[in-house]
A protein has these predicted regions:
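Short loop/turn segments at strand-loop or loop-helix junctions that form parts
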Residues: 7-20, 59, 136-137, 224-227
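Domain-scale activation on soluble regions of proteins
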Residues: 11, 32-35, 117, 121, ...
């Protein structure tokens, strides 16, 4: 569908998710560039549907002239890549939606992977009768120490209002509204449904439960657990196994590559 503008928003240390001295650490940022190219970018280039663009969101205070940021600009990909500051996001989208019926924003981190049908799946949900739609997943994989042989099922807690998701998306029907302040970052992980209902109430539209969708597809995404990812800092007080079950993934190398891209050295 050529009337869809789809941005995948990737937080490249764009907000204060850890101590500021770590947030601006050059070694951390250099590693982040390599991790992005190995994981998130590989899985996005592996998508069946490539009708989307990537936005790498960087912190408002990061110097754009430092090597890690310059390296992001040097990345060669068949997917269009934008590098912008977090506070520039709304204006950027407003400047680029003319002529489109739907704006889709999806979120993932630079160190995670999504299955090859994720973009295709969310774009199939565009419906002219639905003003604002949410889609997330609740059955993921955790990969420990960058080793595909060391992967486990991950079932984030779903409380009926939201779930910890790697690939969350919202569809904004631009025929109903052009309030671009609403994107995937407008909804929280755990309180997304009440926020969506509030939007419907504020705009005098009828909300239906099917407008908030949790997809139960098995093995939808891979949460890459390693020492440099933001949650290793953000959740340092939690048990190291909080993000996985005891159910090991028993799949061959080719299955991982076909589903998530060739991230395996």
């Amino acid at each position: 569908m050529n009337n869809i503008k789809h941005y995948i928003l990737i937080r490249f240390y764009c907000i204060d998710m850890m101590e500021r001295e770590k947030l601006f650490n050059i070694d951390l940022l250099n590693n982040g560039v390599n991790v992005f190219k190995k994981y998130a970018l590989k899985s996005l280039e592996n998508q069946n549907n490539k009708n989307f663009e990537i936005i790498l969101l960087i912190h408002d205070e990061i110097d754009k002239d430092i090597k890690p940021i310059n390296d992001l600009y040097e990345i060669k990909s068949n997917i269009k890549l934008h590098i912008i500051r977090f506070n520039e996001l709304r204006k950027f989208m407003l400047d680029n939606i003319n002529g489109y019926d739907y704006l889709i924003t999806s979120r993932m981190d630079h160190d995670d992977l999504i299955y090859n049908g994720a973009v295709e799946e969310i774009q199939s949900k565009c419906n002219n009768s639905i003003p604002f739609y949410y889609n997330g997943y609740d059955k993921l994989i955790t990969m420990v120490n960058n080793d595909y042989l060391n992967t486990f099922k991950f079932y984030p807690n779903y409380n009926g209002e939201g779930a910890i998701n790697i690939f969350q998306s919202v569809i904004l029907n631009l025929n109903y509204t052009k309030q671009i302040k609403y994107n995937i970052f407008s909804l929280s992980h755990t309180k997304g449904k009440p926020q969506l209902i509030s939007w419907y109430n504020d705009n005098n539209y009828e909300f239906k439960d099917e407008y908030f969708n949790i997809n139960h597809l098995e093995d939808s995404c891979i949460y890459v657990k390693h020492e440099f990812n933001h949650s290793s800092y953000q959740h340092s007080s939690l048990n190291e196994n909080w993000h996985r079950t005891n159910i090991k993934i028993d799949k061959h190398k080719e299955w991982f590559i076909e589903r998530f891209g060739n991230f395996i050295d």
